[in-house]
């Protein structure tokens, strides 16, 4: 038990270290933590020619986004044919390359099923990669409740920081239930609130955040991502409420006028500029 408690403290320490603006962000909304999500599980070059698919493209995009102000990257890797992958070898190779090319950039791996992988495969990925940070959908883990304790216990034991993916208030309620039961461990409190995932046309709006705020703003740390041309408007709204932000081609390819961003770095830079302008 003591070992798990020590590792839980390491998760808290990692959060403090990886959020250089953690304290200031509550005061200065121009500087929330920014996590770039450059590709996702499904989009390809046919969706945008600058969407990174290969290892070299992912590494170059991560470095470019770091250079313009992103603090971390939400990492998806692909098979040779471009399909979504949870292959540990591909993850480890890509993580090493990003660390070499963009030192100081936080790396969060996804465990997204994307209709391809079961919970056992997601758990195996976590064990084999042993990442510093991983995003995990409570909805996906609930497909096999018998493995839920192992998923979160593994992360606690190996020092993997968890960000819970929440698509709606039912997911939030499930997370709270698992926390009360001790399935989700102490210190595993980070949440990503996904706005408009199931909205018509998958178009997010700032008001999509409201259901998550019925009991006030979430306990730190919380982050928001949003789909479609109002992506930056949604993120700016979240920043003013104290949230951190996930931005990139996984969720949005264009600005509010439906003009495509040149690349992920352009979207990150525009968001940062908008945030600074809003508090100027």
Stretch-by-stretch model annotation:
Residues 24-50:
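N-terminal small/glycine-rich loop or linker at the start of catalytic domains
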Residues 67-70, 104, 131, 242-243:
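A structural motif
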Residues 36, 59, 68, 72-82, ...:
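Histidine-centered catalytic micro-motifs
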Residues 36, 55, 83-110, 154-159, ...:
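Alpha-helix-loop-beta-strand connector modules within alpha/beta enzyme cores
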Residues 55-60, 82-145:
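Active-site beta->alpha loop and helix N-cap motifs at the rims of alpha/beta catalytic domains
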Residues 133-249, 260-266:
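Catalytic alpha/beta core domains of metabolic enzymes, predominantly
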Residues 46, 71-94, 253-256:
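Glycine-rich, proline-tolerant flexible connector loops at the mouths of alpha/beta enzymes
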Residues 40-57, 110-119, 140-141, 200-201, ...:
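Active-site mouth loops of central-metabolism enzymes
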């Amino acid at each position: 038990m003591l070992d798990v408690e020590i590792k839980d403290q390491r998760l808290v320490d990692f959060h403090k270290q990886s959020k250089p603006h953690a304290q200031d962000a509550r005061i200065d909304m121009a500087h929330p933590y920014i996590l770039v999500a450059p590709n996702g599980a499904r989009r390809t070059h046919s969706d945008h020619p600058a969407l990174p698919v290969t290892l070299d493209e992912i590494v170059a995009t991560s470095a470019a986004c770091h250079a313009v102000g992103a603090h971390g990257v939400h990492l998806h890797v692909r098979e040779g044919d471009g399909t979504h992958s949870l292959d540990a070898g591909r993850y480890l190779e890509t993580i090493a390359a990003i660390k070499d090319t963009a030192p100081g950039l936080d790396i969060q791996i996804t465990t997204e099923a994307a209709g391809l992988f079961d919970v056992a495969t997601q758990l195996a990925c976590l064990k084999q990669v042993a990442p510093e940070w991983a995003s995990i959908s409570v909805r996906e883990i609930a497909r096999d409740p018998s493995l839920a304790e192992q998923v979160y216990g593994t992360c606690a034991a190996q020092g993997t920081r968890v960000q819970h993916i929440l698509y709606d208030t039912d997911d939030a309620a499930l997370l709270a239930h698992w926390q009360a039961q001790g399935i989700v461990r102490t210190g595993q409190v980070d949440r990503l609130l996904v706005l408009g995932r199931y909205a018509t046309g998958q178009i997010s709006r700032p008001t999509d955040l409201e259901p998550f705020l019925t009991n006030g703003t979430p306990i730190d740390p919380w982050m928001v991502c949003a789909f479609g041309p109002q992506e930056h408007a949604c993120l700016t709204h979240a920043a003013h409420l104290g949230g951190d932000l996930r931005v990139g081609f996984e969720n949005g390819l264009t600005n509010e006028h439906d003009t495509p961003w040149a690349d992920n770095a352009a979207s990150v830079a525009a968001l940062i500029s908008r945030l600074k302008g809003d508090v100027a």
